[in-house]
Design a protein with these regions (language model features):
Chain B
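Intrinsically disordered regulatory regions flanking bHLH/HLH domains
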Residues: 1-127, 131-152
Length: 349, 152
């Protein structure tokens, strides 16, 4: 047992405190996790009281005979043989810990180092496999040269390799790893952008034919500009329409308006027809519109508009059918003021 | 991504916008000059923007930016609108572009177009742009129907 504890120190004690830490770490872990090893070790250790105790426990279920050898803690635990066996194992580990404490002067820093080693292990996982494999084989060769016992050699190997790797990463600048993570992040970002671009491609009409991100972005920019200008233009048109609109809006409450909008073609036919029917009388009927009681407020401005855009009103028949979108704001104004009266008439007749 | 062109957003925008229109129409114009039309246009434009941004709420950057801009615009309204329209027209110059990569000029152009994406990364900006495009399309659709309805 002591020989095994000493053995790692013998071959790795070349000035680095990592070897001492490694030996202690490996020993503690192994002993705490695997009790049966400790029990086997106790047989090898030559401590006859403990081996006799084991024999007693296994043969006669009572632990009476064990009390002579085991201290008082185990005496209190007389419920079963298994728990007492565990207790002996724990005691054994405590002993070994004391030995470790005596042997390692750097034990105070062990916790800190453990954390460092864990961090280094995490870093190492990201590195390329070839280097690690090479390192690992090297460490294996080293371990085989030393006298490590057979049942713990694999565990020792892994521990040693990790320590060696941590040493390795201290020596080498982590250049490759940095670029690796950067390139990974860059790739993820590019994929994200591609997904978003695809999403946008579906939204923007005519964008699916364009290849390349630059062309697509051009299309998107154009489309957004176009939509913003459309909103501008439509609000301008609404502004031009507005003086005549309040009757309509007052007639149609806002809640019912979407219904009107959805069946717009059917709803719009009647006023349009009435509009066209009234059109020939329009230039000769300023008095007729003036005599309407509710439109008195609007009549002066309407007459002004008629004077200013009289030439437009002659071609109103064609414009009326072609729709508002081809008209300037002023012509639509006059058109609408006339259309409003007609609509007003048809609404109340 | 939530679908902003759903019927609920559309109808809510329509309702808000029409309410704003009624409110604007209550104040009767003193004259029919082009100045008056321009003022009216600006108010309608702001009302449309505000209605859309209010419908979307504060969960999107562009709607937040629009609301903030409208709030800040109360004082320097005219100058800002002039500057914005100039900016849009001034951005017409084409950029020399590579085939497959997004150039900085394009990105900046899009940043100027979509409100509230000034300091975003490209991914979030594209997300915002998609949402903004959908909302703008809805807005245009509704406004066109209103105009069509009133113009007949």
């Amino acid at each position: 047992m002591l020989h095994r504890l000493y053995s790692p120190e013998r071959w790795t004690f070349n000035g680095t405190d990592v070897s001492a830490l490694q030996r202690q770490h490996a020993g503690l872990k192994r002993l705490q996790q695997q009790n049966y090893i400790v029990q086997n070790n106790s047989v090898e250790f030559g401590s006859n009281p403990l081996s006799g105790f084991r024999g007693l426990v296994s043969s006669s279920f009572h632990v009476v005979g064990a009390e002579g050898f085991v201290p008082s803690e185990a005496a209190m635990e007389q419920c079963s043989s298994w728990t007492s066996g565990c207790m002996t194992a724990e005691m054994e580990t405590v002993k070994l810990k004391e030995i470790n404490l005596a042997l390692t002067p750097e034990r105070d820093n062990s916790n800190k180092r453990k954390a460092e080693i864990a961090a280094d292990e995490r870093c190492i996982e990201k590195r390329s496999k070839g280097e690690v494999g090479m390192e690992y084989s090297e460490v294996k060769a080293k371990c085989s040269s030393t006298e490590i016992s057979a049942n713990t050699s694999s565990k020792e190997n892994s521990k040693v390799s990790e320590v060696e790797k941590s040493k390795y990463i201290h020596v080498r600048p982590p250049r490759g790893q940095a670029t690796g993570s950067h390139s990974l992040a860059e790739r993820a970002r590019r994929e994200k952008i591609n997904r978003k671009m695809k999403c946008l491609q579906e939204l923007v009409p005519g964008c699916s034919k364009v290849t390349g991100k630059a062309g697509m972005l051009d299309e998107i920019i154009n489309y957004v500009q176009c939509l913003q200008r459309q909103v501008e233009f439509l609000s301008m048109t609404l502004a031009a329409l507005n003086p005549s609109q309040e009757f309509n809006v007052a007639n149609f409450p806002a809640k019912e308006f979407p219904a009107y909008i959805t069946k717009f073609p059917a709803a719009a036919k009647l006023p349009a027809l009435a509009n066209r029917a009234c059109l020939p009388f329009f230039p000769t009927q300023p008095g007729a519109t003036n005599c309407m009681p509710d439109v008195a407020l609007h009549s002066p401005q309407a007459s002004i508009e008629r004077n200013s855009t009289y030439s437009v009103s002659t071609s109103q028949q064609t414009l009326n059918s072609s729709g508002i979108s081809q008209l300037g704001p002023l012509s639509s104004w006059s058109l609408d003021s006339q259309g409003l009266y007609d609509e007003y008439n048809t609404g109340f007749q | 991504m939530k679908n902003p062109s759903s019927s609920s957003v559309k109808s809510r925008f329509t309702r808000r916008f029409l309410r704003a229109l009624i409110k604007i129409n209550r104040q009767k114009p003193s004259s029919s000059s082009s100045r008056e039309i321009f003022l009216r246009y600006r108010r309608i434009r702001i009302a449309a923007d505000k209605a859309m941004a209010c419908v979307i709420g504060s969960r999107r950057a562009w709607s937040r930016a629009v609301l903030r801009r409208i709030k800040n615009q109360k004082r320097k309204r005219l100058a800002d609108s002039l500057r914005r329209s100039n900016g849009i027209h001034g951005m017409k110059k084409m950029v020399a572009k590579e085939e497959d990569e997004i150039s900085y000029e394009q990105e900046n152009e899009l940043r100027k177009l979509v409100p509230g994406v000034g300091a975003m990364d490209l991914c979030s900006m594209l997300d915002e742009t998609a949402h903004y495009v959908m909302c703008l399309a809805t807005q245009v659709q509704v406004m066109r129907k209103i105009v069509d309805f009133y113009s007949t």
